Amino acid sequence: MKIAEIKEMTTNDLVERVEAETANYNQMVINHSISPLENPAQIKQLRRTIARMKTELRQRELNNK
């Protein structure tokens, strides 16, 4: 997910998406520990996407104060 797409999302959508992606990330890590994924780089990409979304949420929080 690109930064521009993240900035277009509403705050509520971002919160929901972060929760969903975090659950997906945790499941992916568990599955990878049991049997290797075809593309383990997906874990890294997902972790960074979650970080981008959390960063945008934090920026919005600081700008609203």
From Swiss-Prot:
Q: Which domain of life is it from?
A: Bacteria
Q: Any idea which UniProt keywords this protein has?
A: Ribonucleoprotein, Ribosomal protein
Q: Does the keyword Chaperone apply?
A: no
Q: Which Pfam families did the record assign?
A: Ribosomal_L29
InterPro entries given for it? Ribosomal_uL29 (IPR001854), Ribosomal_uL29_CS (IPR018254), Ribosomal_uL29_sf (IPR036049)
- An MF annotation (GO) of this entry: structural constituent of ribosome
Q: Which CDD domains does the record cross-reference, listed alphabetically? A: Ribosomal_L29_HIP
Q: Name one GO cellular component term.
A: ribonucleoprotein complex
Instruction: Please tell me whether the keyword Lyase is annotated for this protein.
Output: no
Q: Which GO terms describe its biological process?
A: translation
UniProt record similarity statement: Belongs to the universal ribosomal protein uL29 family.
Please give the name of this protein. Answer: Large ribosomal subunit protein uL29
